[in-house]
Every structure is written in C-alpha cells, then in structure tokens.
UniProtKB/Swiss-Prot annotation:
The chain crosses the membrane at residues 138-158, 166-186, 197-217, 231-251, 280-300. Disruption phenotype: ~40% pupal lethality. Male and female sterility with males showing extremely small testes and females showing extremely small ovaries. Somatic and germline cells initiate differentiation but subsequent development is disrupted. Adult testes contain spermatocytes but rarely contain elongated haploid spermatids. In ovaries, most of the germline cells degenerate at the prepupal stage and the remaining germline cells do not complete oogenesis. Defects in nuclear shape due to a markedly distorted nuclear envelope which is highly convoluted with regions of blebbing and deep invaginations. The gene is Nemp. It comes from Drosophila melanogaster. Residues 388-405, 428-446 have a biased composition (Acidic residues). Its main location: nucleus. It is found in: Nucleus inner membrane. Residues 1-18 form the signal peptide. This is Nuclear envelope integral membrane protein. GO terms for biological process: nuclear membrane organization. Residues 414-424 have a biased composition (Polar residues).
Length: 454
C-alpha cells in the first residue's frame, strides 16, 4: 500500500507539471537575433507550454526596413501556438484554449512568423514533439523595401493610372477572377428560402466558408501543383468574362469618376507604404513629406527656387580659349544657316534687300549656298591674326607707348591700306610729290570704308 501511494503521488506530480500555472509561467526564454534552441521530445507524451520572447530594441532610422523572423522547425502539425506581448498574456491565451467552450477554427499555426524589431513579443509553443526555434534578423528586407517603393509609385501615378485604359482592363480582370467565387456564393444563396431559420444556417455556412478559404490559402502551392489544369481553365474563363464585361462598360470618362478612382489608388498606395515597415512613425513622416511634395503648388516651388538663387547665386564659369573658338564656330555656322534659310523663304523681300546692297551678286551667291567670305578676305584675316600674335610679345617688352594717331585715320584691321602702308614703311622715302598724292588717296579710301562699315 505504501509503494502504491508513492506511485500515485508521482503520477499526480507529473500531471501537475503540465498545468500552465506551474510550468508555463517559469519556462520562458528570451531570444536575441541568431539564437538557436533545440528542444527534445517529452518522453511522457504530455504537451508542455514553453514561451519564447523577443525583447525588442531601440527605434533607429537605419532599421526602417528591418525584419525579425521567428522560425519553428517541427516534424508535424501536432502542436499549438499562442501569441502575446508578455509571457503572462501568452499564458492567459493558453488557459482560455483549455476551456470546454473555446472554439478554435482559426488557430494560428505558422512555422515562420515576422516580428517587429522594436516591440517585445512572445510566442508560446505547446507540443510533445521535439522542435527547434531559431530567431533571425534581416537588416534590409528587400520585400518590404519593394512594397514601400510600389506604394509611393502608385501614390504619384494615381492621376495618370485613373485615365489609363490598359490599367482599367487589367484591374477589372483581376477583380473579376477574385470576385467570381463571391458571385457563385451569391447565386447559391438565392436558392435558399428567405426565412428566419435560414439566417442561422447561412451564418454557419459563411463561417465554414471562411475556414475553407483559409485552408485553401494554406495549401495553395499543393493545389496549384495537383490541379494545375483546372486552375488554368478557371483563370482563363473568368478572365475572359471579366474582360468582356469591362469592354462593355468601358473606361470611366466622367472626371468625377476618374477622381474617385484616383483617390482609391492613392489610398491603396498609402496603405501599402504604411504597412511596409515596422517603424510606423518614420513611415508616417515620409508619407507626409510625399503628400506635401505631391500637392505643393508649382508656383510656390518656383518662388522658393528664385529666392534661393538670388540669395546664393551660382558661380559662372568662364570659357576657355578652345571652348570660345568652338562655340564661335558653331554659333556662326548656325546663324549663317538661319540667314540663308530666311532669305530663301517667302517672308523675305529679296528685291527690297538687294536694292540696299552694294554687291547684290554676292548676296545672290550666298543665298544659293556660296560661302560668306572669299579667299582674299580669309587670307587677310589669317594674316592679321598671325601679325597680332607676333606683335603681342613685342608690345609687352616696349615700355614707352606708341604715338597716338587721330581716331579718324586709324586703319581697319582687314583693310588693304594697312598692308600697303606697311610695305611703304619698309621702303626708302621718295623725294617726289606723287607719293603724297597717293597717300592722300589711300586715306580717302580708308575713310570711305569706315563709312560703309558704320
């Protein structure tokens, strides 16, 4: 009798150890990123609640798109999972499930959970099998970054998308494929009699329907592999019907309808951007800046730019000699081409222009494509440049300034008198009076050339 009593006390102690109040409250493990915990199988076959908590960390901008993943590696689905902010909350959920009146059609069983990096979260696992718990940290979650970028892109492109016919048909086809199941349920509801008792049946049917939808979502990959042909036929038929309905209705033409579509798209983009990060305060701040930049009047933006440029003007860069010569050649060719195009157009009064010119034949040849300078002028220009480059060092070495000549007698840069005068200076002075008359004639020609230039 004494040994039998000890055996009963031992068995009672083992069963008492499985009560949540005795084990779950003390069996708590705090995890850090990179933690790996391997738990062995319960040899007594009892389900033991173990709670795993992530304490969270401080909010930082660098962790805007960071994600913490809780990975549960277990061989079967023979386990229960509970969530909460604290171990006490997890324990309370565990106790609530032990009640005879609890219905758990939507019990959470996921082997991969995404946790907020900035909040404390606890997960309770109740199982008799061996399993492994891993906590991973992803500093930059590319999926969340892509979700944020798509949300901002939809927000900025909502006005154009609301008027795009291709986008209208694509969205209509997608909605038709997803909503076809609801149409089937609606048609099936028409077959039931409209009585008070049937509402309870319909409510229960909707609950079972949601449960079926959840099971379909959990086993979507298996369904796509097993019933690939049926799924493809369903997508083709419902997509074609949806396209025909959208084609019959047509894209919205009313400006108010387009505005409503734009608002809906902007709301969808804002929701996508908001749920793309666990750092909600930073995301809200970014979205406020995006809204202000999107709806900010352009006139205000231009005024701010003008005031900023006036207060901090840009430093102008001077052209180099090579850039100046290149720009001169390009602009001269462009101006000559525009002039030739104008004189050949009906807008130009050719006879009136030719009546004012001293050399109409040269003007006519220029209009027909001839160059604007002849060979002699080009040679004079090249010779003048060479002489000016040779004379520059000599002028710098001479300290005494040259005697000033009268302004009305200064030779033109490309004039023929300049070269004749230079040739005469190199020859000995003649004693006859005929040279004086030639000099006066050259001066008269020079004055005539100046008047023509002016």
């Amino acid at each position: 009798m004494h040994s039998a009593g000890l055996l009963m006390l031992t068995v009672a102690g083992y069963f008492t150890s499985g009560i949540p109040g005795n084990t779950a409250s003390s069996d708590v493990a705090y995890l850090t990123p990179g933690t790996y915990i391997n738990l062995s199988e319960n040899i007594l076959g009892l389900q033991t609640l173990r709670t795993f908590c992530y304490p969270g960390k401080r909010l930082t901008v660098s962790s805007l798109f960071e994600t913490v993943e809780f990975v549960l590696a277990i061989g079967s689905d023979d386990y229960s999972q509970y969530g909460g902010k604290t171990p006490e909350e997890v324990l309370q959920h565990y106790k609530d499930k032990q009640s005879l009146f609890s219905i758990t059609l939507f019990a959470q069983k996921r082997q991969l959970l995404q946790l907020s990096p900035f909040e404390q979260q606890c997960i309770g696992i109740s199982s008799r099998q061996a399993y492994t718990v891993i906590l991973n940290s992803i500093p930059l979650d590319l999926w969340r970054l892509a979700q944020f970028a798509v949300g901002i892109l939809i927000l900025f492109s909502a006005r154009r998308l609301a008027k795009n016919s291709v986008f209208y048909y694509l969205v209509g086809i997608v909605i038709g494929i997803c909503a076809s199941l609801l149409v089937v349920i609606y048609l099936a509801a028409k077959l039931f009699p409209r009585r008070t008792m049937m509402y309870g049946v319909l409510i229960g049917g909707w609950t079972i329907g949601f449960y079926v939808i959840k099971q379909l979502a959990d086993n979507l990959r298996l369904i796509l592999i097993t019933y690939r042909d049926h799924v493809l036929g369903y997508l083709v038929i419902t997509g074609l019907i949806s396209f025909l309905i959208c084609y019959r209705i047509g894209p919205p033409k009313n400006p108010r309808s387009q505005t409503i579509v734009m608002w809906v798209l902007q709301a969808i983009g804002a929701v996508m951007a908001y749920f793309s990060s666990w750092h909600t305060s930073a995301v809200i701040f970014i979205m406020v800046l995006v809204f202000v930049a999107h709806y900010f009047p352009i006139s205000w933006t231009n005024q701010i730019k003008f005031m900023y440029r006036r207060r901090f003007p840009l430093k102008r860069r001077m052209l180099t000699q090579e850039e100046y010569e290149q720009q001169t050649a390009v602009e001269t060719s462009k101006s000559l081409a525009d002039l030739r195009k104008y004189v050949n157009s009906p807008e130009c009064k050719q006879w009136a222009v030719m009546g004012k010119l001293r050399d109409p034949l040269r003007f006519a040849s220029f209009a027909n494509g001839a160059p604007h300078l002849d060979d002699e002028e080009i040679e004079d220009h090249s010779r003048t440049i060479e002489e000016s480059m040779d004379a520059a060092p000599e002028e710098e070495s001479v300290e005494e300034p040259e005697e000033d000549k009268p302004a009305e007698l200064l030779p033109l840069p490309n004039s023929q008198f300049r070269y004749q005068q230079a040739a005469r200076n190199s020859e000995p002075e003649p004693e006859s009076e005929s040279d004086d008359s030639e000099e006066e004639e050259f001066f008269e020609q020079e004055v005539d050339l100046r008047q023509v230039v002016q």
